[in-house]
Amino acid sequence: MPTDAVEVAVLGPVLVHGTAGPFRRSAARDLVVYLAFHRRGVRHAEWSLALWPDRPVSLSTAHSTSSDARRALGCDGEGRLHLPRGVELRLGDAVTTDVEHFGSLATEDDPDQILRAMRLIRGPLFSGLHRADWAIFDGTHANIEALVVRTALRGADAFVRLGRGEEAEWIVRRALQLSPYDERLYRALLMATAAQGNRVRLHSAMAQLRTLAGDLACPPARTAPLTPSDSLHPATTALYRDLLLGSPAAGGHPARL
């Protein structure tokens, strides 16, 4: 069954849209996700190690996995396999990702286009993928997370400047679903709530950050835990103090909890 385009969505629970049929093996779907972020093509030894890093797999298992992925993806509108046969596995050009779509929208200067990009985020990155360690080890996860955070910070700043604090807050909270430990996002959240003139939400955002910082600052083995404020970047506490006084301070220093 021909399908003009297939999209691999990873900005939340992993979905593969536009397939010709279901994946009968979870590893087959995982393989398609892996190939979607390794477009140069990969040999059996590489992708099987990525999907099963803790054990070797037989050629028959690898063959049945790739065959199921090929069957599920089907063909493009011209009858070409989305996953052609060959020594190296490489997805066809009609298979794209939501990260590519996000990136194309994120390059626009129009804040509303950034808003559209942020709507693509549905939850934690690569959520539900059974075999996702490769995304951590080869930097794919970090690169996507960095793209989303940069975009969110740029969009939130633009909306605050336009006096649209609600949109700025929405963008930041969307990004926090994917990158919950980036302190820069919390500084942007403080700015967004302050821009709405809502001191209750400003206090709530800071309380949320302090709770998270407190959880991370108190591992079980620590005998003298840090206070939540000790774990925060000085720029964050300075910004919060100045926002309470009604005089926003400059922020933007990279920091993670």
Region locations from a protein language model:
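Short boundary/linker motifs that mark transitions into or out of structured domains
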Residues: M1-A27, H82-V87, P254-L257
